[in-house]
């Protein structure tokens, strides 16, 4: 009797369900225009902030790093990129920003509920390959511990003379 009940649930249907759960981007973000606009250029000496809306209940370190590498497309040779990823539940309107070397720290005006996930700075060399940039980022990255809570992630960039950032449907909006 037990074997007959098990036969009612074939393995194929279970596999189909798992494929649908692999999408990490939110459904609301896929309908935004930002997902199809490709890359943008961050102006000189300005802070650009992106909000990442995770749908997974746990956000492990490797997923944070993979998400970050998808965002950074190209850094111009000779330019210094300061960046930071912060986690908080506040809405960014006009954040108070201050630079700390290495990396970038953002503090909101009306809240102190900010947790710095990772930060660093990158000085791009002559080689503009993605693998070279990824290697430089790994060397200069300071990754904080215990980043598993469900929350919004904010990714901030500050570049000495512009940086090209490629963002996909994982970004809900940018400020």
Swiss-Prot record:
Keywords: Capsid protein, T=1 icosahedral capsid protein, Virion. It comes from the Viruses. InterPro entries: Nanovirus_coat (IPR006753). It is found in: Virion. Pfam families: Nanovirus_coat. Residues 1-35 are annotated as: Disordered. GO terms for cellular component: T=1 icosahedral viral capsid. Residues 9-25 have a biased composition (Basic residues). Belongs to the nanoviridae capsid protein family. This is Capsid protein. It comes from Banana bunchy top virus (isolate Autralia) (BBTV).
């Amino acid at each position: 009797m037990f074997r007959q009940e098990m036969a009612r649930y074939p393995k194929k249907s279970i596999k189909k369900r798992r494929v649908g759960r692999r999408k990490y981007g939110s459904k609301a973000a896929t309908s935004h225009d930002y997902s199809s606009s490709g890359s943008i250029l961050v102006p000189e000496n300005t802070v650009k902030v992106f909000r990442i809306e995770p749908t997974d209940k746990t956000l492990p370190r490797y997923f944070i790093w993979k998400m970050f590498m998808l965002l950074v497309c190209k850094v111009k040779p000779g330019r210094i990129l300061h960046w930071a990823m912060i986690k908080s539940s506040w809405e960014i309107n006009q954040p108070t920003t201050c630079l700390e070397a290495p990396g970038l720290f953002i503090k909101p005006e009306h809240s102190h509920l900010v947790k710095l996930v990772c930060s660093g700075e990158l000085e791009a060399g002559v080689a503009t390959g993605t693998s070279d940039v990824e290697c430089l980022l790994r060397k200069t990255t300071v990754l904080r511990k215990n980043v598993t809570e469900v929350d919004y992630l904010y990714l901030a960039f500050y570049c000495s003379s512009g940086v090209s950032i490629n963002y996909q449907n994982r970004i809900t909006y940018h400020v």
